[in-house]
Amino acid sequence: SLMVRLAADPSTALRLMAEYPEPFSACEVGEIMAVLRRGMLPIAYEPLIGSPSRNLRIVGLNIVRQFGIEEAERLLLRIVSGDEDPELVREALYTLCALRRPLTRRAVSGRLSAMPPAERKALLRYVVAEGYSPGPLRRLLDERERPYYESL
């Protein structure tokens, strides 16, 4: 129903997304991104990322990732270093990877070390898929993870 309402009146998109009662699923975010790519929802990423609404922040991060907006790096690092929502932090880390930004910063390494092992392993697979060289990232990996990362 959200997508129907967005299509009917795109000018209410931000309000509708912010008021949506449940966290967006990956499918819902994908549908919103498809509408954005078609140019039907003219939305800027910065107000979304800075919004108090979790759903708007997730959409903002996806806009940055999909459109390769490197200028958002400062906002991404702010989320990584200080946000309390683990899902937003994870999405910001994946977005930094998608933009191929340096991951050896203190904020990033601190969050990586605090991640649960399964999430950290998934992120390492994504880092490899994005083409990061193992050399500079060695200091982010503990001894057990280095062989796994290098085997990918």
Segments predicted by a language model, with ranges:
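Helix-capping and short linker residues that terminate individual alpha-solenoid repeat units
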Residues: 84, 101-104, 116
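Alpha-helical repeat scaffolds
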Residues: 16-17, 45, 107-112, 137-145
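Core helices of alpha-solenoid repeat scaffolds
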Residues: 10, 38-42, 73, 105
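Structural detector for internal amphipathic alpha-helices that build alpha-solenoid repeat scaffolds
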Residues: 1-8, 15-38, 46-50, 55-69, ...
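Surface-exposed flexible segments
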Residues: 73-74, 79, 138-140
